């Protein structure tokens, strides 16, 4: 797959998923054009590696379908989701999914990108949607202050889950460069 010039993430490679580390799932909601995504993360804090596997990326999903897919793929594991739709999160939770909204603060996109850039990202070879995003996710401005809001659905899901594990629990124990 061809890589766009100036991609945000250069710290990734395709490799086998290893779920021997802390497991968490990230979710971004879409509907008609943008997909709803669920990404599994296995975080190796000691070696600063995050293993990534897209469980699904689908458009047009109903609340029941999202809940069913989440339960099938995530089981009892925590899913950290986009916080833009609290009613959807509540309905998914009521159907038995262990789901919480991400905490979006001012600057959370940039700090999440910086956090992910500090880790080696190992992408499961079957996660073609994520590979496509990583090859196309670029900065909107030369000053690298805002990414193009496209090619980011799996990436946003990853950011939500990684920030939950690595920032919210450690209260900012990483450095933004």
What is the predicted function of each stretch?
Residues 18-43:
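Gly/Thr-rich phosphate-binding beta-strand-loop-beta motif of the actin/hexokinase/Hsp70
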Residues 15-18, 29-32, 68-73, 91:
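Short, conserved, surface-exposed binding loops centered on an aromatic residue
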Residues 1-27:
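ATPase catalytic-site recognition across NTP-hydrolyzing enzymes
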Residues 39, 46-149, 168-169, 174-177:
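Mg2+-dependent endonuclease catalytic cores in nucleic-acid-processing enzymes, primarily RNase H-like
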Residues 36, 77, 155:
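Residue-level detector of short, conserved catalytic/binding motifs and their immediate flanks
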Residues 35, 89, 163:
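Active-site-proximal flexible loops/turns
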Residues 148-169:
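Acidic, Mg2+-coordinating catalytic module of metal-dependent nucleases/exonucleases
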């Amino acid at each position: 797959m061809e890589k766009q010039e100036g991609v945000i993430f250069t710290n990734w490679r395709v490799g086998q998923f290893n779920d021997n580390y802390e497991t968490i799932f990230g979710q971004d909601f879409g509907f008609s054009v943008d997909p709803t995504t669920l990404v599994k993360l296995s975080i190796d804090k000691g070696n600063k590696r995050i293993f990534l596997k897209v469980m699904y990326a689908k458009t047009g999903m109903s609340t029941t379908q999202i809940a069913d897919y989440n339960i099938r793929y995530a089981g009892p594991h925590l899913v950290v989701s986009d916080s833009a739709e609290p009613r959807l999160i509540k309905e998914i939770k009521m159907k038995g999914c262990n789901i919480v909204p991400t905490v979006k603060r001012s600057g959370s996109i940039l700090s999440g990108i910086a956090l992910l850039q500090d880790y080696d990202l190992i992408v499961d070879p079957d996660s073609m949607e994520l590979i496509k995003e990583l090859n196309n996710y670029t900065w909107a401005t030369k000053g690298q202050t805002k990414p193009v809001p496209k090619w980011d659905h799996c990436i946003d899901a990853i950011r939500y889950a990684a920030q939950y594990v690595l920032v919210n629990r450690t209260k900012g124990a990483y450095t933004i460069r």
